């Protein structure tokens, strides 16, 4: 089990093509603060191949079929359904 499973579950349940969340909302779902790197580096939000990564945070959005599009200045991330 990953600390990012609640985020994955939220995305699995989402019926729309995209979901915009404040970083604070993501933190509420996972029950803890995001790492500093999520606030400082777009790379933390990388859309890695779920078959080739060990990064549990990336798996939270790639396994349900989303791409993360962060806006670090606004402290938001938009998850867009791939396809």
Give the positions of each predicted feature.
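Ser/Thr/Pro-rich, acidic low-complexity intrinsically disordered regulatory segments
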Residues: 1-19, 34-83
């Amino acid at each position: 089990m990953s600390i990012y499973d609640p985020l994955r579950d939220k995305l699995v349940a989402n019926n729309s093509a995209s979901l915009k969340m404040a970083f604070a909302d993501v933190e509420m779902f996972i029950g803890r603060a995001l790492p500093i790197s999520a606030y400082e580096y777009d790379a933390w939000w990388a859309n890695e191949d779920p078959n080739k990564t060990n990064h549990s945070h990336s798996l939270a959005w790639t396994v349900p079929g989303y791409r993360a599009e962060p806006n670090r200045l606004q402290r938001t991330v938009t998850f867009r359904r791939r396809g």
